[in-house]
Amino acid sequence: MELTLHEARVIGCLLEKEITTPEQYPLSLNSLTLACNQKTSREPVLELSETQVQIAVDSLNRKRLISEQSGFGSRVVKYKHRFCNTEFSELQLSPAALAIVCLLLLRGPQTPGELRTRSNRLHEFKDVIEVEDCIRQLMNREKPFLKQLPREAGRRESRYVELFSAASSQLETAQPESASHTVAHVAVSLDAEPLELTKRVTELEQQVAELTQKLDELIASLS
């Protein structure tokens, strides 16, 4: 499966709220929109309209990753995920793995240390080593769920990204573009310096030639 940014946010919110606020789960469209637009525990912070969330929900419904539920005597439709750990889902995750996947869907690439710090409401990890063990299990599958990103300058730990959405492919394309832009910028800077010097030398040569001509004319007039 490959989820869009909005679809990944919807699935992440449903996974999160099922664990952290089970009394409010499943979620109505309004509650789901509020969850998608939270200012905390979300990266990037979005400002989705209910229409945008509904479009994502409808798409997930067609992918059989969401189901609708309405109570007796209530016209409000509520939504629950079929992403994992349901009788309709092929994907079965441990509580630890579910917490990591949920956080990566909601907050993008993160280090094991960040995942441990941010996971306390979803799952209690004993230490970072336990997080790293779980990450390895999610990566060492026939079809991996996570991948490791190159370590960034100034970071002691590498970040990991989930492979359920388009986020990883966007990161892969963004990094070469950034690198090529940097190389191009350096090349232009290096090329620009000799060009400026050449131009300056040409101007000076012209000035010297003009002065020489005027001097010759002055000498000729005096003789």
From Swiss-Prot:
Organism: Shewanella baltica (strain OS155 / ATCC BAA-1091)
Membrane-crossing segments per the record: none
One Pfam family named in its UniProt record: DUF480
SUPFAM superfamilies: Winged helix' DNA-binding domain
Domain of life: Bacteria
Protein family according to the UniProt entry: Belongs to the UPF0502 family.
Protein name, as recorded: UPF0502 protein Sbal_1765
